[in-house]
Amino acid sequence: MPAPAFPAPLMLKSGIRARDAWPLDPDVIHLNHGSFGAVPTAVVEHQDALRRRADLSPVEWFPRIAERVRDARERTAPFLGAHAEDSVFVPNASA
């Protein structure tokens, strides 16, 4: 019996394989990214950068959290086809 033909790897706009965007063990086939799972490497790097900025000047960082959340809602809502005023961030949307 011939080996199964697998589809071409899913590619991101950046030109890298989608699988390579996560810091997952390449020897394991990961199927669950719904209720729990790894965070893409680019997201982890951005989170680290935000934590460093907060740690550099907490006195300036924390008073601006509401403004940063509002800005993030305004940027993400159009991507989701929603209005910013109808959008919220929650810790776990599946809970």
Can you annotate each of these PLM segments?
Residues 1-95:
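Pyridoxal 5′-phosphate
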